[in-house]
Design a protein with these regions (language model features):
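Noncatalytic, solvent-exposed loop/strand surfaces
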Residues: 22-37, 43-471
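C-terminal motif of bacterial Sec signal peptides marking the signal peptidase cleavage site
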Residues: 17-20
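Bacterial N-terminal signal peptides that target proteins for export
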Residues: 1-10
């Protein structure tokens, strides 16, 4: 039976009054005609027939699915030497993971620009959505300029790609629905909320789709400056006005910021992770430093927090840095900023201190990948493989090189993970963690994670994207 330890927790659920300038009608940011990407470089000749195979499984969201498993079941077996077949220089840094939809690779940059490339990585369309926010407009932060950071998501029912762009001037966050075939803006809507300063909020988490809504999560700028509170905002897929949101009932903080964004379970519920909040030892529980399960109305229906959640708040440690990884419909696994890795029971998260197992394994930042009962964690001292047995107990299987810290994905019989500082993609042996092959792709942000499509590994970099052919 599902725990209701948090059923009485207050959830901020409102219908937002949206500004007239950001209604659900079509918008018209400047478009660019299809053509070659300027400054693109290619390390191997790629003809029209050499792109990812037609019919290869799409990768329409962060780590491929709303469960964030990070697995391609159609990628052919990786063999031989990895080849970087494309290095495409775009107009800004790429923090978001690429997504792949109907054979189109969609890439968003921090310049508030979105590109679509065909299976031979030729540009199909390019859409400029406006001007990003420069660093001088914000009190803190580590991205300059700040444009599109959260990974977009595709919805097959509307045929739209959804993404959030931060715009400069009067800092604001705008949700866009783009037609996937043309890049045309179908509608856009402000997703800034009352009670906080837009310039102090950052939209880093990947967008998700559940219950006919697109879900957008918010945390703070790097440095936790100003007036911010964590948010999860749900917007109807048609851009309608019935916008709902959840915010932890804390005075300040509780950012829901990890790049994984909401994880969606088999019931269609959102599993989100709130970071440090304002409640310290002796204060009442405020749903920070927690895993929160939200229903279709953005109400908290279950939660988990470590027994030391309040002390973690005080020390700015604990949970928040890694998204929830799901093992089937039984277990949920996550690490954080301190070292403990937790196993929780799906459907009964356990409340405060109610984990099934916890072991001190590593500091984990980003999104994990899951294959069977094994979770591959993005540890700051190197990816680890951790098995969860039938009783929910953790067993570390291997630990790769301490420089390979990127959020991993799985396909073609390999674990794909980045040494982001060196700009190197590694193909790891799933059994041992040994690097079987590697290739230079260019320096990437610390949270960078690839997309998989056909035989290709598509890597976001600080210059654009690199494409590696794995077989």
């Amino acid at each position: 039976m599902r725990s209701r330890r948090t059923a009485t927790a207050a959830a901020a659920i409102v219908t937002l009054a949206l500004s007239a300038c950001s209604g659900s009608g079509p918008a018209s940011p400047a478009a660019t005609d299809p053509g070659p990407v300027s400054s693109a470089t290619t390390s191997a000749s790629v003809g029209a027939s050499s792109g990812a195979a037609a019919g290869a499984a799409d990768w329409p969201t962060y780590h491929g699915t709303m469960s964030r498993a990070g697995v391609s079941t159609t990628m052919p077996a990786a063999s031989g030497t990895l080849r970087r077949i494309q290095s495409l220089k775009l107009d800004g840094e790429v923090y978001a993971s690429p997504i792949v939809v109907r054979g189109l690779t969609i890439v968003a940059t921090e310049q508030d620009t979105v590109y679509a490339f065909d299976q031979s990585y030729r540009q199909v369309w390019k859409r400029s959505l406006g001007s990003p926010s420069p660093a001088e407009e914000r009190q803190c932060g580590d991205i300059n300029p700040l444009g599109i950071t959260g990974t977009p998501v595709y919805d097959a029912t509307t045929n739209h790609v959804f993404l959030v762009a931060e715009h400069g001037g009067s800092v604001r966050h705008e949700l866009y629905a783009l037609d996937v075939a043309s890049g045309r803006v179908a509608w856009s809507k402000s997703v800034d909320l009352p009670g906080v300063s837009a310039r102090d909020m950052q939209q880093r988490g990947a967008l998700a789709i559940a219950d006919n809504r697109v879900w957008v999560s918010y945390g703070a700028q790097a440095g936790d400056c100003g007036n911010y509170k964590g948010r999860v905002v749900g917007v109807p897929l048609d851009g309608g006005s019935n916008v709902i949101f959840y915010s932890p009932p804390t005075r300040r903080g509780g950012g829901i910021w990890n790049p994984n964004g909401p994880t969606v379970d088999a019931a269609g519920h959102l599993l989100v992770v709130s970071a440090n909040g304002a409640a310290f030892p002796g204060d009442a529980y405020d749903h920070t430093n927690s895993v929160l399960e939200l229903d279709a109305n953005a109400k908290v229906i279950d939660s988990f927090a470590p027994t030391d959640w309040a002390a973690n708040n005080q020390g700015d440690v604990g949970l928040g840095s890694q998204g929830v990884a799901l093992i089937g419909t039984k277990w949920a696994v996550l690490g954080g900023k301190s070292g403990p890795v937790y196993v929780l029971k799906q459907g009964d998260l356990g409340g405060i201190g109610g984990q099934v197992d916890v072991k001190n394994i590593c500091l984990s930042f980003g999104g994990a990948a899951v294959d069977g009962g094994v979770v591959y964690l993005p540890c700051t001292d190197g990816v680890r493989a951790v098995r969860v047995d039938d009783a929910g107990q953790l067993h570390v299987l291997w630990h790769t090189s301490d420089s390979i810290t990127g959020s991993p994905v799985i396909g073609g019989g390999r674990i794909w993970a980045l040494d982001t500082s060196a700009g190197v993609l590694h193909a790891l042996d799933p059994s041992t963690g040994r690097s079987l092959s590697q290739v230079d792709v260019g320096v990437a942000n610390r949270f960078a994670t690839p997309a998989l499509y056909g035989a290709d590994v598509i890597v976001p970099t600080l210059a654009g994207i690199a494409v590696v052919r794995a077989s």
